[in-house]
């Protein structure tokens, strides 16, 4: 503590400096809080995710209308919205003349000033492109009603245009406007899954100014794979093969999958059940490439089932003996017995399975797995991306009195917290999520060891009955490949998913996490909201918001929308309903064709100030430290 005081004294070495900082903090604490955007289940759909960020989930259009009113035509406002969202595309359409720049840049400056009106000048400055910060501030705060200032403004603007800096200047202004409109981003899980653009999503998140991430079930297997879990790795690669983006991640992360493709090519034949699901990308693949993916898909699936068999036997404490599926198969008869019922197997590809020891990998399978794991773990880009997930991520987040988590809080059929029992210790509710987070961070410390308890628990997070990220009785992957009876495909949800409609249970969960404020809410992803069937994203008497982003096109027929995101500004919550995203060019041509529909859920009586937020608590603590410094050293 004494050392900390010495550091403070070095920075604030006079009474005046302490007073100045206290005054600055007080000013910041009394400003309105910034706008937060909550988004979940991106599922690798980069273009749709990028659009939500670029359009600020519909806030941009609103701000343009509020800023310019009737002074601009609707067409002009549309074009300005497109410019701020996709400046690269709009500026690249055709050569812009000096008159266009002279008209457009002042409009962008007006919009920037409007977007930053509730912030301190210091915060606005931090949002500006560093190379133009001084010029932009001069232009922002020039009173053009005065003749001299108007001339000053016009001269600077003309000089920027003549130096051919107008394009990068507009790019910078557009980014600054977007940054001021979305102050903080919450990603409530599942960056990864079916889409091809997960790497691009994380690239964008790496450069986002303020964010947090709540891990989803699909995120956790990527993390597990990087930390050394072979079972997680095979799940990651199998899903990539199934949805046709295996070669995309090979390229994105510089992976070496040659040993896998050589092994699969000579071991497996065509099997239509393993034909990749390409989701409209069929024209990008030749029949030869599709056949190769079919073979690789089979190889990855069988190796995954073997490794999972091994893991379950290695961890009897996980109580997953019923999931040792390969041991239940009669390989001569090609049938499997589940719950005393025998089922015929179809689409089989058991060439490498030894019926006497179904879990054993062949030497070639072992070589392929070791090669893939080494490649996955040695990728520099993978290391950067996993570092972001660890540094910004967690099992849950308490932020501004709200609880954010991806999957579920496991509950008993009675509605009580359901315990995970491990080595006679019970973990339930908040303790359960803390337990898994501890082990995830332990596994991250040594990625050379892939079969320790902590790393195996990451795999359990993916498909274990009491995983807060999975939330189902059982994952039926093998059944879906090889059994026609769809009854065996069913995955029974945890009781949480019915109880989350109960206000009483939602209140119980909030209190379990120490949240007793009437303002507290829960934000949950993971499950698509089937709007077409009358489901609502608002549950539990308004205490819970389910915001599965619905960006995955495969779910949009079921949901009837492209999902939801959530906004929270100083006035309260707004729910945003998204329309299916087509492409950026369509947005540029017709911005309002992609309109996001907003619903105000609740308005607070008084605007929420920074002093009432999570960041505000930190600033108040700083203020108290400075008061202590003032009284102890300067006001004695």
Curated annotation (Swiss-Prot):
Keyword check for Repeat: no
Protein name (Swiss-Prot/TrEMBL): Fructose-1,6-bisphosphatase class 3
Pfam families, per database record: FBPase_2
This protein's record includes keyword Metal-binding: no
Organism: Streptococcus sanguinis (strain SK36)
Alphabetically ordered keywords of this record: Carbohydrate metabolism, Hydrolase, Manganese
Family that this chain belongs to: Belongs to the FBPase class 3 family.
Gene: fbp
The protein's required cofactors: Mn(2+)
């Amino acid at each position: 503590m004494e050392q900390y005081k010495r550091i403070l004294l070095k920075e604030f070495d006079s009474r005046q400096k302490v007073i100045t900082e206290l005054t600055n903090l007080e000013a910041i604490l009394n400003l309105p809080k910034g706008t937060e955007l909550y988004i979940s289940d991106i599922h690798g759909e980069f273009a749709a995710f990028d659009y939500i960020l670029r359009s600020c989930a519909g806030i941009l259009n609103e701000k343009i209308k509020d800023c310019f009113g009737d002074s601009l035509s609707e067409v002009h406002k549309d074009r300005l919205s497109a410019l701020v969202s996709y400046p690269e595309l709009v500026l690249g359409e055709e050569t812009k003349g000096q008159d266009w720049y002279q008209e457009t840049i002042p409009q962008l400056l007006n919009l920037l000033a409007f977007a930053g009106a509730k912030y301190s000048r210091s915060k606005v400055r931090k949002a500006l492109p560093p190379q133009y910060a001084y010029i932009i501030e001069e232009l922002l705060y020039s009173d053009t009603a005065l003749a001299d200032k108007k001339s000053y403004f016009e001269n600077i603007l003309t000089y920027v245009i003549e130096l051919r800096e107008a394009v990068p200047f507009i790019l910078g202004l557009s980014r600054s406007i977007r940054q001021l409109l979305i102050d903080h981003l919450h990603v409530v899980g599942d960056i990864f899954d079916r889409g091809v653009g997960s790497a691009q999503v994380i690239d964008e998140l790496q450069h986002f100014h303020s964010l947090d991430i709540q891990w989803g079930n699909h995120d956790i297997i990527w993390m597990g794979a990087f930390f050394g879990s072979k079972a997680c790795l095979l799940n990651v690669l199998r899903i990539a093969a199934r949805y046709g983006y295996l070669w995309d991640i090979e390229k994105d992360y510089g992976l070496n999958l040659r040993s896998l493709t050589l092994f699969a090519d000579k071991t497996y034949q065509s099997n239509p059940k393993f034909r990749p699901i390409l989701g409209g990308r069929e024209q990008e693949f030749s029949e030869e490439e599709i056949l190769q993916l079919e073979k690789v898909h089979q190889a990855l699936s069988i190796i995954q089932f073997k490794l999972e068999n091994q893991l379950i036997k290695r961890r009897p404490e996980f109580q997953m003996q019923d999931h040792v599926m390969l041991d239940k198969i009669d390989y001569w008869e090609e049938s499997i017995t589940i719950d005393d019922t025998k089922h015929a197997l179809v689409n089989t590809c058991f060439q490498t399975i030894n019926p006497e020891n179904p879990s054993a990998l062949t030497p070639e399978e072992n070589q392929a797995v070791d090669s893939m794991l080494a490649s996955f773990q040695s990728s520099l880009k993978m290391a950067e991306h996993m570092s972001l997930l660890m540094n910004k991520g967690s099992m849950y987040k308490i932020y501004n009195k709200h609880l954010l988590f991806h999957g579920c809080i496991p509950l008993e059929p009675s509605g009580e917290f359901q315990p995970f029992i491990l080595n006679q210790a019970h973990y339930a509710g908040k303790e359960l999520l803390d337990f898994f987070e501890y082990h995830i961070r332990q596994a991250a410390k040594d990625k050379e060891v892939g079969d320790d308890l902590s790393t195996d628990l990451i795999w359990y997070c993916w498909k274990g009955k009491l995983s807060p990220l999975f939330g189902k009785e059982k994952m039926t992957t093998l059944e879906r490949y090889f059994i026609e009876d769809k009854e065996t495909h069913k995955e029974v949800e945890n009781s949480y998913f019915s109880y989350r409609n109960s206000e009483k249970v939602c209140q119980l969960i909030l209190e379990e996490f120490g949240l007793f404020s009437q303002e507290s809410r829960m934000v949950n992803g993971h499950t698509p909201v089937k709007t077409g069937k009358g489901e609502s994203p608002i549950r539990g008497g308004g205490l819970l918001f389910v915001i599965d982003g619905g960006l995955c096109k495969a779910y949009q027929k079921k949901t009837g929308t492209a999902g939801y995101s959530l906004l929270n500004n100083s006035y309260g919550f707004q729910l945003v309903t998204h329309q299916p995203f087509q492409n950026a060019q369509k947005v540029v041509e017709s911005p309002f064709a992609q309109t996001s529909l907003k619903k105000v859920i609740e308005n607070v009586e008084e605007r929420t100030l920074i002093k009432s937020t999570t960041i505000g608590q930190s600033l108040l603590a700083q203020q108290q430290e400075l008061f202590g410094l003032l009284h102890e050293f300067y006001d004695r």
